[in-house]
Amino acid sequence: VNEKRGFHGMDRKDNRLAYTNENTVACCAICNYMKGSLHHDVFIRRSEHIMSYQKMIEGKEYPECFVNVTHVQFVNYVYGAKKRKLEFNLDEEFFDDIVIQPCYICGKKSDDKHRNGVDRYDSKQGYIVENCKPCCRECNFMKSDFTYCTFLDKLYKIRIQHRNTTTSEQLNGYIKCESRKLLAN
């Protein structure tokens, strides 16, 4: 609940559609940010997948809800850290080693079709060895600057809230698997 207004904000279930009674739900700022432009069914499935992978619930995993990314480059991380005025203390060998490991949040593995990136576990710190974890782009975006505990706690609450929600069986591969950028177009 937003303390200033006394109520949650709102979000569209499917961002491709207009704000209508059928397509609008109450949504806190954290959930709204984490969901981004994802279809609500994908967001709920990702929440269940992560909670299952983390062994916080007995549920299903939906690896198809986490898209593949191949353009993960050391130089882009160096540039991004400099641009955001973050300490960057990783060498290329460490970077190359960490991005081939499974995502610490959802378990997505790097392979010839996908490469994980690097998450700063504590977003208040820079890219130092002790603070870096292998992370897929989708989990990195969802976690954002939230603490790991806040992030998992919110996903757990989402999954509990939607434990009896049946996600649409009519989702086509486009909605299930494509990233935010593609859905926004």
PLM region spans:
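Histidine-centered nuclease catalytic patch
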Residues: V1-A26, P102-P134, K143
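Long C-terminal interaction/binding lobes of large macromolecular proteins
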Residues: S168-A184
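Contiguous alpha-helical segments
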Residues: T20, I30, M34-Y104, S110, ...
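Proteins with a high burden of low-complexity, intrinsically disordered sequence enriched in S/T/G/P/A and R
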Residues: V1-E3, E93, L183-A184
